[in-house]
Amino acid sequence: MKTSRYNFLFKFEGKNILFNSKTTALAMLSDDEYDKLAPFVEKESISIDADILEPDLVKHLSYGGFFIDDSFDEIKSLRFDMFKARFNSSSLSLTIAPTLACNFNCPYCYERTSSRNLTITDDVKQGLYEFVKSYIGIINNLSITWYGGEPLLCLKDIEEMTTHFKEICKDKVFYSAGMTTNGYLLDKETLLKLKDLSVSNIQIPFDGFKEKHDKTRCLSDGSGSFDKIIANLVSFKSLYDDKNNKLPSISLRLNTTRENHKDMIKLINYLKEKDLLDYTSPYLAKIDDPLDKVYKHCLTYEEFALLEKEFNDDYASLTGKQTSRNSYPEKISAVCGCDSLNSYVIDPQGYIYKCWEEIGKREFAIGNFKDGVDYKTIDRAYDYMLYDPSEDLKCSNCKILPLCMGGVCPYRRINNVLPSCDNKMKTIKNNLMSFLNTKEIKEAVLNESFAN
C-alpha cells in the first residue's frame, strides 16, 4: 500500500483536513492522526507502515483513495477515464446557430467578419434532421444549444427544428436544450415559449455595470442594451416566484477585463436590489486575448483569481449560497465539446466545426452536410481529441491534474493561449475553502460531525 500522488493536507479553522484531487474525497483527521500522517501523506508513492495507524483509519483512507495499492498506476487510470469520456458515444451534442445575424454590434465579436446576415435554410435543416436520425439507435441523449449571432432573431426556426428533433427522438432518446442569448429579446412571452421548447438553461452575458456594458454591448444603432435586459429579467420575476413553474435556469456570464473589473461587485449588489439573484446565477468569466501580451486590457491570472474570490465571497454574503462556478472541486475528463466525440457546432450554411469560437470561419470547418468530411481540416479535430495532458511533463507531475486536465480549452491551447497553473491551483483551493465555509459544512466541521 502506498500514498496517492494527489493528496492535500491542510488546516481549516483549527481542524485537520485531507483532500484527494483524483477521488475528490475529503476527510477530517484528529490531531493524533494528523501528526502521524503529516510526514508522508502528501508525498508521492510512499510505502505505508500500517502498524502505526489504526485499522479503521487505513480502511477509511483507502476507501477515499488517499492510500492505494502498490501496483496501481494513477496516471494510467486518469488517461483511461479521459479517453473513455472523450469517446463516449451515448450522447450527441449540437450547438446550432440558426443565424449569424445579430441585433448587437459588439466591437470584439469574433463573428463580425463572418456573413452576419446568413439565416438557416430549409436544406440545412433537412441535413440536420438526417444527421440526427443517423445517430438514433446509438445515442441515449440529444442535447441542443441554440447559439448565434442572436438565436432569438430566428425563434420560428427554433420552434420548427425543435418539433422535428423531438419527433425524431420520440421515446427512444432523451431531448434537452439550452441557449446563449444577449437577452435583449428575452421578454416574458419569449421565456415561456422557450420553456415549451424544452430549453432548460439560458446564458446571458454582461460586460459590467450600465455605462461599460452599454459601451461594448450596444445595439446596431449604437444605443445601450443594459436597461432593456434588466427590465426583461424583472418582467418574469413573478414566474420564478412560483416554484411549480419548471422554468429555464438563467446564468449571467460577467465578462471581466481590466476596464470593467471594478463594476462586478457593484453589479451583483444592483441585481440584489432588483431581487434578481433569487433566480439568476452570476459568475465571473475571464476574458483572454492572445495579442494582449502585457495585460493592457486583460487581467493577469493572479489578479483574476483574487477578484473571483472577492466576488464569490460577496455573493455568498448577499445570498447565503455559492456562485454556480464556485462549487466543490470535481474531477473532469473531457474539457468541452472540442474534445468530445459526438459534439459539433453547426452554422447557418451547414458547415460543421468542433469549437464555438471557430463558427463562421470556413477555414476551420471540418465538413458540411452537403459534401461530408473535409480531409484538409479534419486533422484539427484529431488534435483536439487526441491531446493528452498526462504526456506534458509539467501536467503529469501536477497534483491537481484530475481537476484540470491541461487547464485550458483545446482551441486556446492550439492557439497558444496557455493557462496559469498557479491561478488554477489558487482557484481550486479557494473553491474548496468556500465549500468549507458554507454554513452547514462549517458547522459540521466545527462540531466534528464531519465523517471520513
Regions found by a protein language model. Give the residues of each.
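Conserved alpha-helical substructure of the radical SAM core
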Residues: 76-192, 197-200
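Short glycine-enriched, charge-decorated loop/helix-capping segments at active-site entrances
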Residues: 113-117, 215-223, 415
